[in-house]
Design a protein with these regions (language model features):
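Mature catalytic core of soluble alpha/beta enzymes
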Residues: 2-21, 25-27, 32-358
């Protein structure tokens, strides 16, 4: 069943220059006080072009300083494996291999396997091999826009296709055709959150909230003895320095990932057309639909992250169809109608509170 709420549309002014803001951010409604029986600790840091915040119950007397060091080391390992911003990373080596086999680590293999799984399940709406197309539109690691033409788009598309990836599981190796480029940006942050959560659980920590770049995974309860309450951003004015909440959602041993087209885009100075970073792998062009943001809830942040991207490609109608046909996924979608009026859909299974706006 649909759950719809109409909200006031934001006033927008098209400006003829390039705007780029790293990441999508989710407000975290963290508990202010701790219960008398168990202290909670919060660790903060920077990673993957964003920030992280980890809050956990200190019922196992974990050394916070030591854990903080392990977290940073783990995030560094993930970057060394899957960051296109690191020239010496495994993914950079794979993309420069010109068809040769490259030995990869367990983390790379897990993310690659999940990426292909989601690509198949979404009929290519999620595709980890569109790195060449992403770079053409100026959303790659170097942020340099190419000469965008129908010819160049088709040439870039010809260098993509997840079904062209070859994997040798016994040798832990991968091969991609010459000119192909793998990009895990739409799934790696979710994987990082899951990996950090598993690190906490290996320490015996049963109550925690892990947040990295707006992607969240929770378990157990917060310091007030409640399930974790997480805020979802309202996708408002692209130039706004502050942020407003659209909704507050209660997570019960669940993960949340949000994707949207309101913070990473550029505007054509001549036409005034806004081109957002979500690329449709079938057309090779930025996805054009009425969906402003998709927040997906799943047990794993990895899958929530990937499907949030797929939903932005699909648009709200296809995403609603997916959510209502899959018992393991839930979502909050913010979209507009033809007149620019805003609406919110949310899965009825979610415990959600809509935030009133003026």
């Amino acid at each position: 069943m649909y759950r719809l709420m109409r909200v006031n549309a934001a006033n927008r002014n098209g400006l003829g220059r390039f705007y780029f803001v790293l990441g999508l951010y989710t407000y975290l409604l963290l508990a202010i006080t701790c219960s008398p029986s168990t202290a909670y600790e919060t660790l903060h840091g920077q990673a993957q072009g964003s920030t992280y915040s980890i809050q956990f119950a200190q019922d196992q007397l974990v050394d916070g300083i030591e854990l903080h060091g392990e977290i940073d080391q783990l995030l560094s390992r993930i970057d060394s494996s899957m960051s296109t911003y690191v020239p010496s990373s495994l993914i950079s080596r794979v993309n420069q291999s010109e068809g040769a086999w490259v030995r990869i680590d367990d983390m790379f293999m897990k993310v690659l396997t999940r990426s292909i799984e989601v690509a198949n399940e979404t009929d290519g709406a999620f595709d980890p091999t569109i790195g060449s197309v992403v770079r053409l539109w100026g959303f790659g690691f170097d942020e340099i826009r190419g000469d965008i033409s129908d010819k160049n788009i088709q040439e870039a598309l010809a260098r993509s296709g997840f079904d062209q990836i070859k994997i040798d599981t016994l040798a832990s190796s991968v091969s991609i055709p010459k000119g192909f480029s793998i990009d895990f940006n739409a799934i790696a942050q979710g994987f990082s959150v899951d990996t950090l959560a598993l690190l906490l659980e290996s320490k015996g920590i049963q109550n925690y909230m892990v947040e990295l770049g707006g992607e969240v995974r929770t378990r157990g309860y917060n310091a007030q003895g409640d399930h974790w309450n997480i805020g979802i951003d309202r996708p408002i004015n692209e130039l706004a320095t502050g942020r407003e909440l659209q909704a507050i959602i209660t997570l019960k041993n669940q993960s949340l990932a949000t994707s949207g087209n309101y913070r990473k885009f550029w505007i054509d100075e001549q036409t005034g057309i806004k081109y957002a970073h979500t690329i449709d792998p079938k057309t090779g062009r930025p996805a054009m639909n009425q969906l402003l943001s998709a927040s997906i809830v799943h047990a794993e942040a990895t899958m929530a992250d990937a499907y949030a991207t797929a939903c932005m490609v699909w648009g709200h109608l296809k995403c609603i169809e997916f959510l209502e046909g899959n018992e393991d996924y839930f979502g909050v979608l913010i979209y507009t109608d033809e007149e620019g009026n805003w609406f919110t859909y949310y899965s009825p299974e979610l415990n959600i509170t809509m935030v009133q706006t003026d």
